[in-house]
Amino acid sequence: MATAASNPYLASSSILSSGSIVHSDSGGGMQQGSAAVTSVSGGYRGDPTVKMVQSDFMQGAMAASNGGHMLSHAHQWVTSLPHAAAAAAAAAVAAAEAGSPWSSSPVGMTGSPQQQDVKNNSGRDDLHSGTALHHRAPHLGPHQTHAGAWGSTTAAHIPSLTGSQQQQQSLIYSQPGGFTVNGMLSPPGSQSLVHPGLVRGDTPELDHSSHHHHHHHQHQHHQQAHHGVNSHDPHSDEDTPTSDDLEHFAKQFKQRRIKLGFTQADVGLALGTLYGNVFSQTTICRFEALQLSFKNMCKLKPLLNKWLEEADSSTGSPTSIDKIAAQGRKRKKRTSIEVSVKGALESHFLKCPKPSAQEITSLADNLQLEKEVVRVWFCNRRQKEKRMTPPGVPQTPEDVYSQVGNGHFLVDYLKDASLTGPSEPGDQRVTTTSSFHQVILAH
């Protein structure tokens, strides 16, 4: 307390009122204060060579403590460090300013809370502090030699720090010796006290091995991804038909389908029952007309090919025919009659619109047609004549066709009917003539 009484500048300082970490005795020596003894526990258990280096720096710190010029600059960045590092730095500032007449009140005011941080943060996790100090290590002022001096003073007068604080203290003055805050090169003589490899998590081997392991993991992942891309089926284009094949198959399919007597709707329904994929009549029609996309044509071709094989194999088997007929309605074959045969049937119809069964049989034999075909043709012809003949006409179609003979007689007949006078309300001649005119034009 002799220093506080003799020095008027430190009378109101909070460093002495709150219990300074270090005190200066009357003989000029340095000893630990009571607050420092109660706040920390355990002695300094370090390497003897480090103690020797610290003792050498302590002598330089004692000589530098008389000039307070470096302390005013050092205080500007001491308070910007993390809590644990700032606590150790503030303790060093307080120790150096104890015998300096140039100490200002802001330094003394910041000394007390930083001293409390030394007490409260003595058990902090060294991982957090080591990471933070590792990134903030280059923050040194221009007076780097003075910073090394008060760093050694801190190491000499606070020997009872815990293991984590010792590491933080080592990180304070183990910054890279090549650069300063302003980016200028430091003097050649200023070197780091602690080898960067001793800092936990900053070893080059660990960093290199971690980087190598990460790179190796990425390389394996890239190989797996590349192998996954190239592991698709190699036989994707072997069975793909060409456009010419699809066109030929569509034409052949249409001919065979008509020959078998199935409609497009029957084929679509049969595909749904046999293979599980129901297709509409429009889809089958578009396939035959080559109006589907190439992809859909390729998908539909094997199904239609299977259906054709099934239909061909079931031609002589009643059970197979019934199986296919159950998928849809089987249409009868459409009969196409030649022009000469149709003329013979027409002439026979004019003579006898309703032939008997014997006449139909003899006519079918003469024309080499089936009996059912001849019978159906006469039925359809009578229905057609009934649609063309209006009701109330006294003349029969046979009489009309027998009178017509050729087109000239028809024209004369229409002229005569149109030149007659106004008909009576009950007369139907004009209406009948116009109706016959429509019938003849239709033929």
From Swiss-Prot:
Localization of this protein: Nucleus
InterPro entries attached to this UniProt entry: HD, Homeobox_CS, Homeodomain-like_sf, Lambda_DNA-bd_dom_sf, POU, POU_dom, POU_domain_TF, TF_POU_3
Pfam families: Homeodomain, Pou
Extent of Basic residues compositional bias: 210-225
Tissue: Predominantly expressed in the central nervous system.
Residue ranges with Polar residues bias: 101-121
Region (Disordered): 21-40, 100-150, 182-244
GO cellular component, one term: nucleus
All copies of domain POU-specific, residue ranges: 238-312
Positions where Phosphoserine occurs in the chain: S317
Gene3D superfamilies per the UniProt record, alphabetical: Homeodomain-like, lambda repressor-like DNA-binding domains
GO MF: DNA-binding transcription factor activity, RNA polymerase II-specific; RNA polymerase II cis-regulatory region sequence-specific DNA binding
CDD domains: homeodomain
Keyword Transcription assigned: yes
Keywords: Developmental protein, DNA-binding, Homeobox, Nucleus, Phosphoprotein, Transcription, Transcription regulation
DNA-binding region listed in the record: 330-389
One annotated GO biological process: regulation of transcription by RNA polymerase II
Family according to the record: Belongs to the POU transcription factor family. Class-3 subfamily.
Function statement: Transcription factor that may play important roles in patterning the embryonic brain.
Protein name, as recorded: POU domain, class 3, transcription factor 3-B
Lineage, broadest ranks: Eukaryota, Metazoa, Chordata, Craniata, Vertebrata
Encoding gene per record: pou3f3b
